[in-house]
Amino acid sequence: MESLKTDTEMPYPEVIVDVGRVIFGEENRKKMTNSCLKRSENSRIIRAICALLNSGGGVIKAEIDDKTYSYQCHGLGQDLETSFQKLLPSGSQKYLDYMQQGHNLLIFVKSWSPDVFSLPLRICSLRSNLYRRDVTSAINLSASSALELLREKGFRAQRGRPRVKKLHPQQVLNRCIQEEEDMRILASEFFKKDKLMYKEKLNFTESTHVEFKRFTTKKVIPRIKEMLPHYVSAFANTQGGYVLIGVDDKSKEVVGCKWEKVNPDLLKKEIENCIEKLPTFHFCCEKPKVNFTTKILNVYQKDVLDGYVCVIQVEPFCCVVFAEAPDSWIMKDNSVTRLTAEQWVVMMLDTQSAPPSLVTDYNSCLISSASSARKSPGYPIKVHKFKEALQRHLFPVTQEEVQFKPESLCKKLFSDHKELEGLMKTLIHPCSQGIVIFSRSWAGDVGFRKEQNVLCDALLIAVNSPVVLYTILIDPNWPGGLEYARNTAHQLKQKLQTVGGYTGKVCIIPRLIHLSSTQSRPGEIPLRYPRSYRLADEEEMEDLLQALVVVSLSSRSLLSDQMGCEFFNLLIMEQSQLLSESLQKTRELFIYCFPGVRKTALAIKIMEKIKDLFHCKPKEILYVCESDSLKDFVTQQTTCQAVTRKTFMQGEFLKIKHIVMDETENFCSKYGNWYMKAKNITHPKAKGTGSENLHHGILWLFLDPFQIHHADVNGLPPPSAQFPRKTITSGIHCALEIAKVMKEEMKRIKENPPSNMSPDTLALFSETAYEEATCAQALPGVCETKTNLTTEQIANYVARKCHSLFQCGYLPKDIAILCRRGEDRGRYRLALLKAMELIETHRPSEVVFSPATGVWGSHIVLDSIQQFSGLERTVVFGLSPECDQSEEFHKLCFASRAIKHLYLLYEKRAAY
């Protein structure tokens, strides 16, 4: 079979398959006298289409044989159209577009997408080559029927290997009622015979379990090897059966294969070799081979050997047997490559459904070549649920002028490069409805290496336009520009389909631009795509933007972090909605929140729910916390009254009906019993009567059981008395890498519990439940640890990292630098100011550090972890005087205050 290779000469950022010279046109193909050539051309094209469908899409390049050919006048050819329709029964126009460019015909192939209204076929196939018996026919199953069989066999394998019920011959002979099972029993009796007579008539016919074959050709063995795989696959995948070679299927008479044409020993050996080579796929652990028995019966005519009848008994198979490898193709190593049976099954079922051993064996080679058929596991489960809300919030499609996003990065770029904004407005003209999304490197965002010669990339997504990727070069003579732009465009397109789940037709046209010129680079050829690859309307644009949201959330970038924070806010809103359902029936509640839950944000949402549910005035709801910084932050976030525990104990709150207490793990009983005071306010009793409460207000207490600081004097009831209680383990509102740090710390604490932590508290942490929540919600992020540093080295590291973040569009208000001890703040502040001035992160006059009380402001926060309790920022640096195993409790404190980036920096141990 001729190997089809990719074309590297064409400038498209696509996988391009060159199928060679082809005759096109309705009349031209009708006149073809060379039927082999006609079939070969058809086969080359259809295999290439199948491979591209299963590999993220691409372009097929065919050289037109007839120099006078015009696609507009002559069309494709009926045999080609028929093949396309068979491959794509839902309509080939959904996936294929055609364009003539000079003497080449280009076929644009969209990535395969499962039909949401039928069985979710993960890949496209020409033929499954998986057969089943249907009465007297061996049926090559359609892809959907094959998927049903695979699921059925997989389910049965989980319950044990299937068995075939065997009936005794006497039961048949004694019955007056005839049924199909009788034919199987009669065939089994026939199988026991030693010899046959020529023209002997059988007392049974073809059925689900019986197939008759007669060959008049001299080439008996080649014909048997040609047809046998179909029947063995069909019988093995159904209920077993018998193939009788040498019996006329019409007269049911024994005719045999003439003895001079057949060597019985050779025939038996060839049959065994043929069956043993059949591809199989196992769901079971035993993995047996196909079980069959071959028997050669002599056929006599007047006591003289006339020939042979060959009977093959095929037992039902535990799993599935193929007649040959499925006729399904992918792109691999720049070639159109046929899938093996095992690869095909894995992809049909998706690796998440396949046996773990196969995921290990095949996942790595299939992800790159055919991941368009599946969703990537590289994003949390809930991302798709919120992609529309995220898109509408971050990338609203408006009728106004084209928007530039993200705003902070655009502001930085346009400030540093004054001509860039005007250049971009010129480039995108005449687009009037769309979004340009900037990145320091879209290549880095999709998993490629960033290039120093690239100032930035800008992605134009606009109505009535194809998607365009502008690469702004620093050095216009950089020779790697075209390759960089094409590779980035191609990879981003693949991600939109495989990760983002975009099912429409999409192209990304790369354009290289230098700041000094709006012209494309010399030698850059304008790319033409079919009109269907333009975004036709707002709906298509929104669909693509939603796919981009998913792609961005699965990467590490400024855009990802901004989306991630909004994604976590949506998760918190969802969590608060579930939690608020307990407000009516549970007026007092202890809410245990593990690190990463962001309980302050949850507490704020609950106060809003209380106000709406009980129709309260804001002054009737009180929020209580330990620190002034957290109190000030909450005051900015809500209209309800917020105070510290100290203020709460010193004041009177006569109008308060409901109290939400946050960060109670940091409380202490200094100034009095805060818990009883809160309870008396929310559940007051009439003076002197001892009667029941006048009203039942809300008293909800939020705490992190793994960060309790004053267990003996914190004023909380003992853990055994903290009821009713609800434990929130499903909310992980931070980066995956940070969640892993917190999980390991909680696991370590559970294995070596401190004396002040009760066994009941430790039992609440389930590693499995925490991992499930992490998989559902956590996003990619950054966590780095550096040890044995000097103060100067720590300051330089922070300064360099901040400089890098600011270049990418992060703002000072995204960053918190937290010290393990409050007394270290002044020492670190001086070192950081010096380092930041040297590295020119900002101009010296702009370097401002704010204490935790200024968290709502626009400066970098520099304070202790205690003062930052209950607060969080996207980027957190945790500075610790020394790395001491006994002090690693602070790692959990640092991690619980970071959303996407965590940098843990430890000084050298002091010498004594």
From Swiss-Prot:
Co-factor note (free text): C-terminally truncated SLFN14 endoribonuclease requires manganese and magnesium for its endoribonuclease activity.
Outcome when changing K218E: In BDPLT20; the mutation results in strongly reduced protein stability
Keywords: ATP-binding, Disease variant, Endonuclease, Hydrolase, Nuclease, Nucleotide-binding, Nucleus
Region Required for ribosome binding, annotated ranges: 392-571
One Gene Ontology cellular component: cytoplasm
Positions of region (Required for endoribonuclease activity): 206-391
One GO process term, biological-process aspect: cellular response to manganese ion
Nucleotide-binding recorded as keyword: yes
Sequence positions that bind ATP: C593, F594, P595, G596, V597, R598, K599, T600
GO molecular function terms noted in the UniProt entry: ATP binding; ribosome binding; RNA endonuclease activity
EC number: 3.1.-.-
Outcome when changing V220D: In BDPLT20; the mutation results in weakly reduced protein stability
Top-level taxonomic group: Eukaryota
Pfam family, one: SLFN_GTPase-like
Family to which the UniProt record says this protein belongs: Belongs to the Schlafen family. Subgroup III subfamily.
Disease per record: Bleeding disorder, platelet-type, 20: A disorder characterized by increased bleeding tendency due to platelet dysfunction. Clinical features include epistaxis, hematomas, bleeding after tooth extraction, and menorrhagia. BDPLT20 is characterized by moderate thrombocytopenia and platelet secretion defects. Inheritance is autosomal dominant.
Protein name: Protein SLFN14
Lineage: Eukaryota, Metazoa, Chordata, Craniata, Vertebrata
